[in-house]
Amino acid sequence: MKKKKALPSFLYLVFIVLLPWGVSFSFNKCLELWIKNWWNTRQSQTLLTAIQEKRVLERFMELEDLFILDEMIKEKPNTHVQNPPIGIRKEIIQLAKIDNEGHLHIILHFSTNIICLAILSGSFFLGKEELVILNSWVQEFFYNLNDSVKAFFILLVTDFFVGFHSTRGWELLIRWVYNDLGWVPNELIFTIFVCSFPVILDTCLKFWVFFCLNRLSPSLVVIYHSISEA
């Protein structure tokens, strides 16, 4: 009877997992035009925002230096540029447009993520009964396994998340989160996260193995340590 109830619950879990991608794709298409019109209307009175100004100014100085160098190579006597040449002006406008697109990307992804989070929270709340049934079935399935198989699965999960090669996976994950949210990558934050989070997670898993599994099945803990130390 529990297995029959677990199948709809499992399908509901698959639906929840796939829901964010479907919602993100749908709302990206719906919100993109509206956000673009709103942003362009808001930016119609100014070409550069305060956020863009520093980046564009740095790029302008680079272009101006390149232009002066080019004039010196051509042996023109007047190498001091009073006004930006047309090519540099076009480059500045192009940089402003690129920055605008970046800000639109951030706003669009932030909006869709908020909507996804709201829908996902509602789905968890409305499907609480199905998730409880699925959780009880998974626990029953796990407890019915012999201790060797349990130890194998526990070791597989722990090595997957906190093993030697897991740091690369965590780095890819946080980079994906930054890219999805439209944030500027920060290598310092990436390094701190990759160095600290797996260690914290490993400590929590060891605590769970020692204190929780030891009460459930001492032989399971012995088998787990024998396999991990082999």
UniProtKB/Swiss-Prot annotation:
Sorted UniProt keywords? Antiport, Chloroplast, Hydrogen ion transport, Ion transport, Membrane, Plastid, Plastid inner membrane, Potassium, Potassium transport, Transmembrane, Transmembrane helix, Transport
Membrane topology of this protein: Multi-pass membrane protein
Task: Provide the Gene Ontology terms for cellular component.
Answer: chloroplast inner membrane; plastid
Q: Which GO terms describe its molecular function?
A: antiporter activity; proton transmembrane transporter activity
Task: Report whether Isomerase shows up as a keyword of the record.
Answer: no
Q: Give the reactions, separated by semicolons, that this protein catalyses.
A: K(+)(in) + H(+)(out) = K(+)(out) + H(+)(in)
Principal place of residence: plastid
**InterPro entries attached to this UniProt entry:** CemA (IPR004282)
Look up the signal peptide feature and give its range: none
Compartments where located: Plastid, Chloroplast inner membrane
Q: Which PANTHER family match?
A: CHLOROPLAST ENVELOPE MEMBRANE PROTEIN, CHLOROPLAST ENVELOPE MEMBRANE PROTEIN-RELATED
> What protein am I looking at?
Potassium/proton antiporter CemA
The gene is: cemA
